Design a protein with these regions (language model features):
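An N-terminal assembly and electron-transfer interface module characteristic of large anaerobic redox
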Residues: 1-273
Length: 273
């Protein structure tokens, strides 16, 4: 760095100032981030505490906001200056014509999402991309249902580079399955994909280009689907049939014909063709 002030963290700034023989106590006071907040790489203050502050900082009226994709991430990404994955997702989403709304908060707070994703009780996002671990799936499920938003997930592979991930026969470590797959799916999160890996050399978390592009495209497609009339949507209905064959329509302890008739009737009543 040309000067200590160019270092990405106050710790490094103080260390470089000390090594240069300067008084590190003359450096600016550290920025204290709120327990929960909203982030965007374009914000001069890095993080704001409320949705209203976020929209004001972005120059957007929340009552007339564009289609919005919220990105849930860990506060540690900011504390460790490892926001490249979140920044990349935000850029891809906004390049697609939507607004990105990255946010973080305590994972054990049963009201955490609603505090950051609503204004006056109304959702300020249309889709959520989750990158957090899921610790309380029942609480998260209730929040997702209350918000009425589809949720997909981008997870990280922390055992090496993108090339090593592609070569791995499993793709996801077994120890990650409970918190990043099983509990996430129980909470209602769908389409869980690996979207980041470690960069060789400095082991910084970076996006896997094709995977991150797929996550952003999925989020943008969900935005389009949300505004498309039901009559224009194409829905496939897949059902269980046992024993296998073309001459029967059955399942254990279930009246499958009646269930299908009820489901198709409900879809038709909702405007699907």
């Amino acid at each position: 760095f040309a000067s200590p002030e160019e270092a990405p963290s106050l710790y490094l700034q103080a260390l470089l100032a000390w090594r240069a023989g300067r008084d590190w106590r003359q450096l600016p006071e550290p920025q204290v981030f709120p327990t929960a907040g909203l982030y965007h790489p374009s914000l001069p203050q890095i993080v704001v505490a409320t949705p209203a502050e976020y929209f004001a900082a972005r120059g957007i009226d929340p009552a007339h906001r564009p289609p919005t994709v919220a990105i849930a991430f860990h506060q540690g990404s900011i504390a460790s200056t490892q926001t490249e994955v979140i920044d990349d997702l935000a850029r891809r989403i906004e390049a697609g014509g939507a607004l990105a709304l990255p946010f973080y908060g305590p994972m054990m707070d049963p009201q955490g999402l609603r505090k950051l994703l609503t204004i006056d009780g109304r959702p300020i996002a249309d889709v959520i991309v989750n990158t957090q671990i899921t610790l309380t799936p029942e609480d998260r499920r209730k929040e997702f249902e209350a918000l009425g938003l589809p949720v997909i997930q981008a997870m990280a592979w922390r055992r090496g580079s993108a090339e090593q991930w592609r070569a791995d026969p499993h793709g996801i470590p077994l120890m990650d399955v409970p918190f990043y797959l099983a509990q996430a799916e129980y909470a209602g999160i769908a389409d869980i994909q690996v979207a980041a890996a470690l960069r060789p050399g400095d082991e910084q978390l970076v996006p896997i280009d094709a995977q991150a592009a797929a996550i952003a495209a999925k989020a943008l497609n969900l935005l389009k689907l949300k505004t498309k009339p039901a009559a224009d949507k194409r829905v496939a209905l897949m059902f269980w049939n046992y024993p296998a064959g073309e001459k029967n329509l059955s399942a254990s302890f279930m009246n499958l014909p009646r269930s299908l008739a009820g489901t198709l009737g409900a879809l038709q009543a909702a405007g699907y063709r």
